[in-house]
């Protein structure tokens, strides 16, 4: 079992258009609605592969009720915390080549009591002895930047492995608490260390510096350049080619889910990275923020190396 905490979940509406032009009327060629938020996506991907996942999240308003229904229908166990506000709705505009323009609402403001209930829900889930607990995504307005750091400390005290996928100050605070795993993307890692990271060598150096701060594993998602895994005794790079990209929404979440699923079922870190890259590549080939099922992942070739070319320039 893997527990996810998503403080700012969403309803994700994905609209496909022929091209995006500012100031013009566009006709949709397709649309879909999915439960969203980083942790929600991780839970969805895990459930699609038969691993029990518990999603702890705030739920309010019509969007919150829809979120619960959609998420439960995917096989995820939902532990909702009732809130007075409404769950946010995000919109993604996707062009035929996979270019995605996202519009994300900030989310509802949680009261002190609602936030306390959310933290209590995560603590209750921790008592069930999961293989991992994962804190994911942005924080709603007004929520203290220490939220994920507190989750890390609680998980470590309970003897549960803990992963964090967020950005900015909440990520920096979580790093200081010493999580087992963080999964920033290229831009988030650059922001965290306060430096541009134009090459794979720069990314590697930045990731290694975080190990000295107490993080045990760093997985950096690099878009079309795959992902880099750095631990105290291992560096590995994995990459897969997507023939027909449809949407990048949720691809990093699928990568994280694949890595966690593999480690929870006994895989070594390198093999877990390969699994994560395959899951992420599969997600890019799917519409909207749909998470990949086993049939989507099967057969995706991943080039995995433990001696990557660190001179690789990471073009956007």
What are these regions (language model features)?
Residues 1-56, 65-66, 242, 310-316:
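Glycine-rich phosphate/adenosyl-contacting loop at the front of the ribokinase-like
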Residues 2, 52-54, 78, 162, ...:
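Hydrophobic anchor at the start of a short beta-strand
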Residues 44, 89-93, 226-230:
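Short beta-strand scaffold segments in enzyme catalytic cores
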Residues 47-130, 300-316:
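Conserved N-terminal subdomain of the carbohydrate kinase-like
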Residues 108-111, 139-143, 170-173, 191, ...:
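Short, small-residue-enriched loops and turns at beta-alpha junctions
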Residues 127-142:
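Short acidic, glycine-rich surface-loop motifs adjacent to enzyme active sites
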Residues 146-162, 166-233:
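Conserved phosphate/ATP/ADP-binding segment of small-molecule kinases
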Residues 172, 200-316:
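Conserved phosphate-binding/catalytic region of the ribokinase-like
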